[in-house]
């Protein structure tokens, strides 16, 4: 994407001109996980199609709107719908909103996703706090000329998911009595679901779950110095572990069932972020 900085500036200026809030936190709501915004107050909504240079989400379960609202006293941006590499977007387009968030002054990003479980201890409906990632998407959003105004040429990935935010999430879950697991998320290009042979290989590499998002966004946010917290909703067991065929409708069904718990958890975490 040419003139990325200038395009992101144009998007950011449009958002600032059409909203009154200036959040320092942004949350991305994955497939079937959009219930968090029901708890927003003073909500302002912008359709992606109205924001200059913004891609438009095409996947069922992704609304395609940017919200600015309040959770308690905390101002938050919420993306209802994300962009996936398998939809035909470039990696720069997939991660475009995060460049805009950086220019809007966002410092912390909360990512959610619906994904498949590889770890056999994770049943469908399990919430997994992501501790690290493995990139098997075949590319990287930071390939190409680097703009130092966003970040360094060779960004560090020692702590892709903020230890500070993970500890806050764990403490909050314990106080609320919410069960969760911790694990490694593998990013897979899609749109085909994985084969049983691929899942066996991924398990051997140390992956606990696999999905088609989150990894590019994580890399870009770390590159720009933003702290990331990410939680997966395990909606199905991966190929070769479960015997039934995969269905996106089933993914949405399980995500919706677990969504209330996830939203209660993350809503509390976000309100405790400083």
Regions found by a protein language model. Name each.
Residues 14, 18, 164, 168-179, ...:
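Generic non-transmembrane alpha-helical segments
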Residues 146-185:
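Metal-dependent peptidase/peptidase-like ectodomains
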Residues 1-157:
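Metabolite-binding pocket within alpha/beta catalytic cores that recognizes anionic/polar moieties
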Residues 101-105, 203, 222:
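Non-catalytic positions within long, well-ordered alpha-helices that form the structural scaffold/packing
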Residues 239-274:
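His/Asp/Glu-rich mid-to-C-terminal helical/loop segments that flank catalytic regions of hydrolases
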């Amino acid at each position: 994407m040419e003139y990325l900085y200038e395009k992101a500036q144009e998007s950011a200026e449009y958002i600032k001109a059409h909203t009154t809030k200036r959040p320092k936190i942004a949350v991305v709501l994955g497939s079937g996980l959009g219930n968090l915004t029901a708890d927003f107050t003073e909500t302002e909504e912008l359709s992606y199609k109205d924001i200059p240079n913004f891609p438009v989400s095409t996947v069922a379960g992704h609304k395609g709107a940017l919200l600015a609202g309040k959770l308690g006293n905390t101002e938050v941006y919420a993306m209802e719908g994300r962009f996936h590499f398998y939809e035909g977007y470039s990696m720069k387009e997939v991660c475009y909103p995060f460049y805009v968030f950086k220019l809007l002054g966002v410092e912390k990003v909360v990512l959610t996703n619906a994904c498949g479980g590889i770890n056999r201890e994770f049943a469908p409906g399990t919430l997994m706090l992501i501790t690290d990632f493995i990139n098997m998407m075949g590319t990287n959003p930071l390939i190409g000329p680097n703009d130092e105004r966003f970040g360094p040429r060779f960004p560090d990935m020692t702590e892709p998911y903020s230890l500070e935010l993970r500890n806050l999430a764990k403490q909050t879950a314990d106080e609320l009595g919410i069960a969760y697991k911790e694990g490694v998320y593998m990013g897979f290009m899609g749109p085909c679901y994985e084969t049983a042979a691929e899942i066996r290989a991924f398990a051997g590499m140390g992956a606990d779950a696999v999905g088609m998002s989150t990894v590019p966004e994580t890399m870009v946010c770390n590159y720009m110095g933003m702290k990331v917290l990410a939680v997966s909703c395990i909606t199905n067991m991966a190929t070769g572990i479960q015997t039934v065929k995969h269905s996106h409708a089933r993914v949405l069904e399980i995500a919706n069932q677990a969504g209330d718990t996830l939203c209660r958890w993350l809503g509390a975490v976000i309100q405790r972020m400083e």
